Regions:
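N-terminal leader/linker segments that initiate helical-solenoid repeat arrays
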Residues: 34-77, 81, 88, 95-99, ...
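Hydrophobic/aromatic packing residues within the alpha-helices of TPR/SEL1-like helical repeat arrays
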Residues: 47-49, 83, 127, 166, ...
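Structural marker of alpha-solenoid helical repeat scaffolds
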Residues: 54, 89, 133, 169-172, ...
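Start-of-helix register in tetratricopeptide repeats
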Residues: 60, 95, 102, 139, ...
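Canonical tetratricopeptide repeat
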Residues: 64, 99, 143, 180, ...
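Residue-level recognition of tetratricopeptide repeat
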Residues: 67, 102, 109, 146, ...
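Register position in tetratricopeptide repeats
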Residues: 71-72, 106, 110-113, 150-151, ...
Length: 325
């Protein structure tokens, strides 16, 4: 009997201890949850009371919207609107300035002759601000070099400034500096100097893709499409996972009027980067040009499913109606 009593008492003690343990664990967890909740509330209050944090978050949101719209050049007006707000909220972010410059350039096609002269200075200003915000970015400096090379003097173009920026790039990366200077020489009409630097860059880093990309564009510019295709094939070989390599190869094929090869290259670029929706529209146009109305109709519909609004979407609807008859 005493044994049974002791067993019951021991059982009660064990259950009581277990309940106390569970209760203590629950209290610890509850305390942790409360602390986290208070921390989140404090973070929220700190966010609400801090214009800097709030503006940075808003700027990031506008930036993302701008970049999304920039995927479709015909939506560049919307991209500009969002990216201008991002820059307004955070003027210290070089990427925001750079992408706003990209949006202005994308808008050139739709700006017309009257607005173009007003857009060019904005491109220059945003690129200069991007470089100021991030002086070690070779991407921003290269974009500024290209502006100085291609813009007329009245809009801020300057070969001297382009070479100066190329010198700055060379201080960061000798290889990229050679390519930048080569591009400036090409713009100046110094083809021999440009080609010499392109070849020197390839020799110094045969496994890097940038020289093949730049040299290919140079050949496109002087109308040597066969040489351009050779360079872009090499570009795609050393950078097979880059959508841009296949796009550039396709672009050269298109200028050579090698349309089946063009379509295959563009499809590969789309496979690697589905956000390149303008290529779907381009493929539809190529099929239409080749006389394949069924595939053209299919690709225009495909484009509309991806981009239901915008200038190009309106054009796609017109094409779908025309090809249906």
């Amino acid at each position: 009997m005493n044994v049974l009593v002791r067993r019951k008492r021991n059982s009660v003690v064990v259950r009581s201890a277990a309940r106390r343990y569970v209760l203590s664990v629950c209290m610890v967890l509850l305390s942790s949850v409360c602390a986290q909740s208070q921390s989140l509330q404090m973070d929220q209050k700190r966010f609400e009371n801090s214009p800097i944090l709030r503006d940075a978050a808003m700027a990031g949101a506008y930036y993302k919207l701008g970049v999304e719209n920039l995927h479709e050049p015909s939506n560049s007006d919307r991209a500009i609107e969002h990216l201008e707000k991002a820059v307004e909220l955070d003027e210290s972010n070089g990427e925001y300035h750079y992408m706003l410059a990209e949006a202005y350039m994308a808008n050139f096609e739709y700006a017309g002759l009257v607005r173009m002269p007003f857009l060019a200075p904005k491109v220059k200003s945003q690129l200069e601000l991007a470089v100021k915000c991030d002086p070690i970015s070779t991407v921003y400096r290269e974009a500024l070099v290209n502006y100085y090379v291609f813009a007329p003097a009245i809009l801020g173009g300057s070969y001297q400034k382009a070479h100066e920026q190329s010198d700055q790039i060379a201080r960061i990366d000798t290889y990229l500096g050679m390519l930048a200077h080569a591009g400036v020489y090409a713009g100046e009409g110094e083809g021999d100097k440009a080609e010499q630097l392109y070849r020197k860059a390839i020799y110094s880093r045969p496994g890097s893709w940038q020289a093949y990309h730049h040299f290919g564009n140079y050949y496109v510019g002087i109308g040597d499409l066969d040489a351009a295709i050779v360079m872009f094939k090499k570009y795609a070989e050393v950078a097979p996972d880059q959508a841009e390599s296949h796009y550039q190869l396709g672009r050269a094929f298109q200028q050579k009027r090698m349309y089946p090869e063009t379509i295959r290259s563009f499809q590969k670029a789309l496979e690697l980067d589905p956000s390149r929706t303008p290529l779907v529209f381009r493929i539809a146009q190529l099929y239409e040009f080749m006389g394949n109305r069924a595939l053209a109709h299919e690709e225009y519909q495909h484009y509309l499913s991806m981009v239901p609004s915008g200038r190009a979407a309106d054009d796609a609807r017109v094409k779908i109606r025309e090809l249906a008859h």
